[in-house]
């Protein structure tokens, strides 16, 4: 039995999230279907670094799986690329030690959120970015983001449905990239993220960019540890990308 690590990307528009769910199309289900077919009907399960919600994309999701097939990692990559749908891509496949774990071995992740700042709605980017036709002061967003850097209890910045007992996470950095006059990318790097955390942080920073909330409001929300204390909405899923997963 050999363990394989794969880095995959996918367009989340056509999936009901990553995780297998009854009677729905998911990323995990499509990949496991292909692997099971390769193994002549024997079920093969995959493990990912984490789940993504409906409409959320991935540029660098990491999975692992075990196989008894006597084929190279390169052939696995080519076969899976052919046998999975066009909205999933296998960027790399490699053999790894048996103790490698895609989920529990992570030491950090990067998510990016894409904002289209056009006055007129662009139908071609509707599934891949948030349309935000309002004025933004990027300098205010940067000031607000500094209050979020470091180790904090992010209870106020995650969904009430978060299953984790501890809401303490460390944000290493929040960077802002103005790719052109119309596109703003916000990059979040941290040791881990809670359910809806990046989308809530994005909504908060957009409000800061409009002057609706101040850096002090963010500090107070962190201390309150109560999602109801935060006025900012959760940004929609289509602008969010799991960009990179780091391991030791």
From Swiss-Prot:
GO terms for molecular function: RNA binding; tRNA pseudouridine(38-40) synthase activity. GO terms for biological process: tRNA pseudouridine synthesis. Pfam families: PseudoU_synth_1 (PF01416). The keyword Isomerase applies. Keywords: Isomerase, tRNA processing. It catalyses: uridine(38/39/40) in tRNA = pseudouridine(38/39/40) in tRNA. Substrate binds at residue 111. Gene3D superfamilies: Pseudouridine synthase I, catalytic domain, C-terminal subdomain, Pseudouridine synthase I, catalytic domain, N-terminal subdomain. Coiled coil: none annotated. Its EC number is 5.4.99.12. The keyword Protease does not apply. The active site is at residue 53. HAMAP family: TruA. Belongs to the tRNA pseudouridine synthase TruA family. Formation of pseudouridine at positions 38, 39 and 40 in the anticodon stem and loop of transfer RNAs. Homodimer. This is tRNA pseudouridine synthase A. It comes from Listeria monocytogenes serotype 4b (strain CLIP80459). The gene is truA.
């Amino acid at each position: 039995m050999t363990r394989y690590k794969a880095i995959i990307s996918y367009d989340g528009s056509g999936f009901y999230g990553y995780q297998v769910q009854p009677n729905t199309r998911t990323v995990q289900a499509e990949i496991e279907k292909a692997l099971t077919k390769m193994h002549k009907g024997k079920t093969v399960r995959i493990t990912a670094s984490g789940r993504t919600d409906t409409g959320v994309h991935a540029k660098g999701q990491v999975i692992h799986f075990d196989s008894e097939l006597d084929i190279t990692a390169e052939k696995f990559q080519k076969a899976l690329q052919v046998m999975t749908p066009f909205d999933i891509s296998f960027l790399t496949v490699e053999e790894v030690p048996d103790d490698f774990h895609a989920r529990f071995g992570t030491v950090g992740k990067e998510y990016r959120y894409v904002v289209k700042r056009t006055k007129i709605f662009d139908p071609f980017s509707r599934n891949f970015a948030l349309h935000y036709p309002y004025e933004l002061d990027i300098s205010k967003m940067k000031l607000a983001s500094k209050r979020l850097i470091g180790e904090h209890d992010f209870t106020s910045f995650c969904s009430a449905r978060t299953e984790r007992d501890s809401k303490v996470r460390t944000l290493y950095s929040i960077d802002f990239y103005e790719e052109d006059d119309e596109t703003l990318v916000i990059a979040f790097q941290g040791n881990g993220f809670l359910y809806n955390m990046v989308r809530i942080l994005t909504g908060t920073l957009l409000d800061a960019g409009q002057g609706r909330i101040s850096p002090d409001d963010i500090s107070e929300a962190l201390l309150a540890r109560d999602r109801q204390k935060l006025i900012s909405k959760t940004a929609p899923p289509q602008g969010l990308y799991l960009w990179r997963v780091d391991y030791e």
